[in-house]
Regions:
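Short glycine-enriched nucleophile-adjacent loop
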Residues: 35-46
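Active-site nucleophile loop of the alpha/beta-hydrolase fold
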Residues: 52-62
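Active-site nucleophile elbow and catalytic-triad environment of alpha/beta-hydrolase enzymes
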Residues: 107-126
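Alpha/beta-hydrolase fold nucleophile elbow
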Residues: 21-32
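Short beta-strand/loop motif that positions the catalytic acidic residue
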Residues: 128-130, 136-138
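Conserved alpha/beta-hydrolase "acid-adjacent" motif
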Residues: 143-149, 174
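Catalytic histidine-centered segment of alpha/beta-hydrolase-like enzymes
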Residues: 169-179
Length: 192
């Protein structure tokens, strides 16, 4: 029920609360779509000390190029452009082999599935507000592994503490398998 931009604003309020409580170092991260949101956050809002992307997921540009939901994305864009952002769009989402039906406002749908929007990880990485340590952890059995670091990681502003780590895992098990390396990286980055 909330646009991608609105979701990032909610995250921004959380970051502000942590800062106001005296936290000096704040990371933003997540797994799959959460990783996508962490990357988008640094592009749209910024102000965190590091970004952690575990098994990054949701690739609207690639989905659009393959024709997945293309007509619905175009319809949602038209509704938004025509001032009818509240029109409902019904679609079936495919996530890790699971199908689920949704009915959402056109502006919400388009904000998440816009091939050139915040969900486009390569574009968002290239638009980081400033250089921050960026950790990308991907499993050997994740479909995105074939794209390598050039897909989005390399597009972020360079930082000497950024790392691209490959673990022997699938999309779902990457956080568990990579947990020790993530903890070590956080400890390293937090020393600065």
């Amino acid at each position: 029920d909330e646009t991608y931009e609105g979701t990032l604003q909610s995250l921004s309020e959380s970051v502000t609360r942590y800062r106001s409580k005296g936290y000096k170092t704040v990371f933003i991260g997540g797994q799959s779509f959460g990783a996508n949101a962490a990357i988008a956050y640094q592009a749209a809002v910024g102000g965190v000390d590091g970004v952690i992307a575990l098994a990054p997921g949701h690739s609207p540009y690639e989905m659009y190029q393959m024709g997945l939901n293309r007509s619905l994305i175009d319809l949602a864009k038209k509704h938004v452009t025509d001032g009818n952002a509240g029109e409902l769009v019904e679609f079936t989402d495919l996530n890790q082999g699971q199908r689920k039906n949704f009915s959402v406002r056109a502006d919400v749908f388009f904000s998440y599935f816009n091939p050139d929007g915040l969900g486009n990880m390569a574009l968002s990485a290239s638009r980081f507000k400033h250089s921050v340590p960026f950790l990308w952890v991907i499993g050997t059995q994740d479909w995105l592994i074939k794209e390598g670091s050039a897909y989005a990681f390399d597009k972020a502003p360079q930082n000497p503490q950024s790392r691209y780590i490959v673990v022997n895992a699938n999309h779902a098990t990457t956080p568990e398998v990579g947990a020790d390396q993530v903890v070590d990286w956080i400890a390293l980055v937090s020393k600065r």
